């Protein structure tokens, strides 16, 4: 049953337990929540107003930009820049680090986001989401932001989460003390605590992957996927395939039911030999969430949260979900790619 605890109340309770807390993080999160409400409003009426289809532009990833994707990006940049506690931002849609405009107050936090994950599904009314990651800067406040302030390993995150726009709008996040889910109550316009202390089952029976890319995978990756399609596993029968094609939606289902999401490296595009997903705005925040929920995340050989990025839009293979399934994947790669 939903508890009548708002996101702000939850954060303030947590803030009291931290010596020297200034309230800046809570203020930052309040702006993020407001952005989510604005984006959710537009998503819910997407078929009624002119926000479907493409803008005609191509983003830094070489992808055609959806109108709603561009809208979400613009809202997040505008709102978050005015939070007064950020020194920089980064977005999947922008080639470079986004600086806080001159004249606006700044702080020690950095936010990195994918404004609308799963945007290829927008026009067909499939669940989509916003993914975010929050760091503290390493350089001194008042000095220019350095690339090292943004290019931090996932284990340095102070918070991570996502907003899922579906049959209801949900905010799921962690600040390092477990994973908590809040559901938007449209009657009062607030996110209320609905899923406290979320935990992923230690093993599941779902695997999520686009098997259409099978011809482009390495032999080791084919053995990984083949393991879940066979009866030679912990369940003695094939896992169920469930794949939406929206990372947030697939991740959220597996978080609740257990299972594993996979986006392996492939050789479809020589420009993307490490797969499609971005380390900073997709893999790292999801990895922090899953580990806080008791799961695991790897690129096949290395823990996602240990990877130090060398590029703002660096891509990584991603295997994320229940502990048993991810450890099995790591073992298969170790045996076949040693």
Swiss-Prot record:
GO terms for cellular component: cytosol. Binds 2 magnesium ions per subunit. GO terms for biological process: fructose 1,6-bisphosphate metabolic process; fructose 6-phosphate metabolic process; fructose metabolic process; gluconeogenesis; sucrose biosynthetic process. Pathway: Carbohydrate biosynthesis; gluconeogenesis. The keyword Magnesium applies. Keywords: Carbohydrate metabolism, Cytoplasm, Hydrolase, Magnesium, Metal-binding. It is an enzyme of class 3 (hydrolase). InterPro entries: FBPase_C_dom, FBPase_class-1, FBPase_N, FBPtase. CDD domains: FBPase. It comes from the Bacteria. Pfam families: FBPase, FBPase_C. It is found in: Cytoplasm. Its EC number is 3.1.3.11. It catalyses: beta-D-fructose 1,6-bisphosphate + H2O = beta-D-fructose 6-phosphate + phosphate. Its cofactor is Mg(2+). SUPFAM superfamilies: Carbohydrate phosphatase (SSF56655). Substrate binds at residues 117-120, 210, 243, 276. GO terms for molecular function: fructose 1,6-bisphosphate 1-phosphatase activity; magnesium ion binding. Its main location: cytoplasm. Mg(2+) 2 binds at residues 114, 117, 282. Mg(2+) 1 binds at residues 92, 114, 116. Homotetramer. PANTHER family: FRUCTOSE-1,6-BISPHOSPHATASE-RELATED, SEDOHEPTULOSE-1,7-BISPHOSPHATASE, CHLOROPLASTIC. NCBIfam families: PRK09293.1-1, PRK09293.1-3. This is Fructose-1,6-bisphosphatase class 1. It comes from Maridesulfovibrio salexigens (strain ATCC 14822 / DSM 2638 / NCIMB 8403 / VKM B-1763). The gene is fbp.
């Amino acid at each position: 049953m939903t508890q009548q605890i708002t996101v702000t109340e939850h954060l303030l309770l947590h803030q009291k337990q931290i010596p020297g807390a200034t309230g800046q993080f809570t203020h930052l999160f309040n702006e993020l929540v407001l952005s989510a409400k604005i984006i959710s409003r537009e998503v819910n009426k997407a078929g009624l107003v002119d926000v479907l289809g493409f803008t005609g532009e191509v983003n830094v990833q070489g992808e055609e930009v959806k109108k709603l994707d561009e809208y979400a990006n613009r809202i997040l940049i505008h709102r978050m820049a005015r939070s007064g506690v950020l020194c920089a931002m980064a977005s999947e849609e922008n080639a470079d680090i986004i600086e806080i405009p001159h004249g606006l107050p700044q702080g020690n936090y950095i936010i990195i986001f994918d404004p609308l994950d799963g945007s290829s599904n927008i026009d067909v009314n499939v669940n989509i989401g916003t993914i975010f990651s929050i760091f503290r800067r390493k350089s001194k406040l008042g000095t220019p932001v350095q690339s090292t302030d943004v290019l931090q390993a996932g284990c340095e995150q102070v918070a991570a989460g996502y907003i899922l726009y579906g049959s209801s709008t949900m905010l799921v996040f962690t600040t390092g003390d477990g994973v908590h889910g809040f559901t938007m109550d449209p009657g009062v316009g607030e996110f209320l605590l609905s899923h406290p202390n979320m935990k992923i089952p230690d093993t599941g029976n779902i695997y999520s992957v686009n098997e259409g890319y099978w011809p482009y995978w390495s032999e080791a990756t084919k053995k990984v996927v083949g393991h879940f399609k066979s009866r030679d596993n912990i369940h003695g029968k094939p896992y169920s395939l469930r794949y939406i094609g929206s990372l947030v939606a697939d991740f959220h289902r597996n978080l609740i039911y257990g299972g594993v999401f996979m986006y392996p490296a492939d050789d479809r595009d020589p420009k993307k030999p490490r797969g499609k997903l971005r380390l900073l705005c997709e893999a790292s925040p999801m990895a922090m969430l899953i580990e806080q929920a008791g799961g695991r995340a790897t690129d096949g050989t290395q823990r996602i949260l240990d990877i130090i990025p060398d590029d703002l839009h660096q891509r990584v293979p991603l295997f994320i979900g229940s502990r048993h399934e991810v450890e099995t994947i790591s073992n298969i790669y170790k045996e076949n790619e040693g």
